[in-house]
Amino acid sequence: SALDGYLKDIMQRDMQNFLNEYTGDMILVTHSRDEAYKFCGHLTILDSGQALTTGETKKLFERPGILQAARLTGCKNFSTVQKMGKHSIYAVDWDLMLQTKDVVPDDVTHVGIRGHWMKGASEGGENHMEVEVVEYIETTFEHQYLLKNKKGGDCQPVWWMCPKGNFEEDPRAKVPKYIHFPEEHLMLLKEAK
């Protein structure tokens, strides 16, 4: 963690080469979701010393199933939910009805979506929320917006990340009127017991 980005990338490439040649099992302990994703084909996610879930790394990042596991894999956007139908939920904290690709289980407690998977839109529609900017953060290669449902009230904001086109672009030009929550990227979650 004390290495600069360039040296860390070189070390990680060397580590990947070593792992590609190694034929046995290994255990990698890391607090970096990026390292876990890069180096591990299978993953066990721990919270407070307890195993939350185990499985293929890409599948766990896509569908962690458990709220705490989604947090540990870096998801920032969560809402408590009410099941409304076989493929529909009401996201209480966002004041938003959502249609889901997956069948909604009876024990669902939350929905999550990664900030990189949401899409900006100029018009409303299914799984769209009219938004206003609460906060903006500029990083080297992306814009990060904290967006809130324009309905107001006690709605919780969501993080939306989008790549920069160049270093000079105006971040206000990227702000959409609506944000779209693609149904294929909605994570239906339950709390660990």
What are these regions (language model features)?
Residues 1-65:
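ABC ATPase nucleotide-binding domains
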Residues 3-4, 69, 120:
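A generic structural signal for short coil/turn motifs at secondary-structure boundaries
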Residues 13, 67, 79-81, 129-134:
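Small-residue-enriched segments and motifs
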Residues 60-63, 72, 121, 189:
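Residues that scaffold the ATP/ADP-binding catalytic core of kinase and kinase-like folds
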Residues 62-84, 112:
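C-terminal boundary and immediately downstream tail of ABC-type ATPase nucleotide-binding domains
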Residues 76, 87-193:
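Non-catalytic connector elements of ABC transporters
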